[in-house]
Amino acid sequence: MNDSRETLEGASALALPGAGRYALRRTRVLGRTLGAPSGPLDADGFGLVDILVDEGAIAKIAPAGAIDFGAMPEVAMAGRIALPLFVDVHTHIDKGHIWRRKRNPVGDFRSALAAVIEDRAANWTAPDVAARMEFSLRSAYAHGTAALRTHIDSVGAQTRISWPVFAEARERWRGRIELQASPLFSIEFVLDDSHMADIEAMLDAHGTGILGAVTYMVPRLHEGLTRLFALAERKGWELDFHVDESADPAARSLKAVADMAIERRFSHRILAGHCCSLALQEEDERRKTIDAVASAGLGVVSLPMCNMFLQDRETGRTPRWRGVTAIHELKRAGVHVMIASDNTRDPFYPYGDLDMMETWREGVRILHLDYPFADWAPAVSAFPAQAMGLDLGVLRQGGPADMILTRARDFTELLARPQSDRIVVRHGKASSARPPDYAELDALFGLAP
């Protein structure tokens, strides 16, 4: 090997060439993460390719050894896996990292909600929200996220505090993370004209064309959905719902959302998050709901880590259910399904770091997304990108040279370890970003340096 070529010999040895033009030799990629086919795939859905990077773009992807790249610098990947950057379609960066200040006393959903409401009223000033959002985004960026959608608590005075903060963050992170946001409030608030006037004003000024609400079985659910859909139609907005985050099989608002979309022939994207109770319904009822979801064209996002933490929790009793939706049945019906981070170090989930590699690893374990493994790779990349209307989540010729390089050579190596030594590549260059130190948040919690 000549001196201009790099080798992958240790966790700290992978170094991309300083030149703007180089080749990644014998790189293992999942066929489902490529923009176009490039050679044969093995039983797990992987293929070996060479990738030519030219001034921040992917100039060529070809079967390994098919092209002579000449004397340009090379990285000998030796069958290590490259992934597209992640897309995290369901997060809550406005409430992230408040655990030190406000814990969930018993770990269930009701206590989480009460704790967040108390902390929001007492502490969520613009500087507080901004600091926690920034910390969250720095974490996501360091881990290899290209795009992120957050839900923003939008009730009372908080609406006018948090949305301008989000808009400033979105502008500050432009070109690094593509940010979107959806308002979060219970469906009953749609019936309050004053509340909805505030929501419309904030989304007009600071939003990203997405309207949302939390749906559950309340007496005026149909009226609330009718008004919400009508506003979205008038404004040309997409919809993003929190749906049936419950262990009650009678929680069936997902069917109501799907039926409303079909009835109104709603033409914009709709995403439904959680949908936990679907997994606990009788087979006939579940099938009817899934058929409606597929017919309406809804996307469904499961939040495996948070839902496993909250659902079926009773003090002193072992959980009988993992808390997640019927994701396999939805996928089999043709529904675009995806997984995302959800809450991070707050009363709804005291763990997590907006690391989609962790979300993927845990999602595979919790949801059995491994037979076949390759079929589920788009759930953390291409499918959430499509749900956000973005041309991201795949490796393609002509696209940006944005990817994650790992030392893993198959799916068991990829998921057995946290890939802490991954190399995040953005525009052809290795990113130097690292997750921020938790001590940076100490001032928010009155902790001495």
Per-region residue spans from a language model:
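N-terminal metal-binding scaffold of metallo-dependent hydrolase/deaminase domains
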Residues: M1-F69, F411
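Active-site metal-binding motif and surrounding structural segment of the metallo-beta-lactamase
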Residues: G65-L83
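Di-metal (Zn2+ and/or Mg2+/Mn2+) metal-binding site signature of metallo-dependent hydrolases
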Residues: R80-R101, S246-A247
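Alpha-helical scaffold segments that flank or form the walls of functional sites
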Residues: R80, W99-H151, A157-R172, D198-D204
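His/Asp/Glu-enriched, well-ordered alpha-helical/loop segment
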Residues: E238, D259-I270, L310, W321-T406
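Histidine/acidic residue-rich metal-binding segments in metalloenzymes
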Residues: I161-G175, L191-G299, G316-I339, G393
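C-terminal cap of metal-dependent C-N hydrolases
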Residues: Q386, Q397-P449
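Active-site gating loops and adjacent loop-to-helix segments of metal-dependent hydrolytic enzymes
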Residues: G96-V129, G207, K235, S253-L271, ...
